[in-house]
Regions:
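Acidic/histidine-rich catalytic cores and adjacent linkers
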Residues: 2-19, 27-31, 47-158
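Short, surface-exposed amphipathic charged segments that create phosphate/polyanion-binding patches used
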Residues: 34-45
């Protein structure tokens, strides 16, 4: 079953359907990554720095030349925001991985970096990803989804 990363839903599914394979929904995972990264950007804005939003949220391959330059500046001058952006992009790569081994290697690298992060908000995010590691890795080539995220949410809430 594909679900968002809510512990209560995961526990309920495991209790009601113990044989069900729980998969962390990639859409919700990347949405959460974007939200966390944008919060790090807003923290910097509160200190008086103006950081553009789109270079951080867009897929790097889709950036305009100007946005790519803005992203390079952010990476150079705003370490915490750059760390959140790196994790977000690496998480995208987990879902783009062509093999389970590649996905696991990328996720392990994320977990290692998050564990030693200088930003206090990045450490608990890393712990959340670690708790959901198996469910995140369950969704990539070679795996399968049993239903759409919305359908699973309706069923698990019903």
């Amino acid at each position: 079953m594909t679900i968002d990363r809510k512990e209560s839903r995961k526990k309920r599914i495991q209790r009601v359907l113990p044989e069900a394979r729980v998969v962390a929904d990639p859409f919700h995972g990347l949405q959460d990554a974007g939200r966390r990264m944008d919060e790090a950007r807003r923290v910097e804005r509160r200190t008086g720095h103006r950081l553009p939003r789109w270079p951080l949220l867009k897929n790097e391959a889709d950036l305009t030349e100007r946005q790519a330059k803005e992203l390079a500046t952010i990476r150079q001058h705003f370490r915490n925001v750059a760390q959140f952006h790196w994790v977000k992009e690496q998480l995208r790569d987990v879902y783009r991985a062509t093999s389970p081994e590649e996905a696991k290697a990328i996720l392990d690298r994320i977990l290692f970096e998050a564990e030693g992060a200088s930003d206090a908000a990045l450490v608990p995010w890393g712990r959340t990803l670690k708790r959901w590691k198996n469910e995140i890795l369950a969704d990539h080539p070679g795996g399968h989804r049993t239903a759409t995220p919305r359908a699973c949410t309706r069923r698990s809430n019903g």
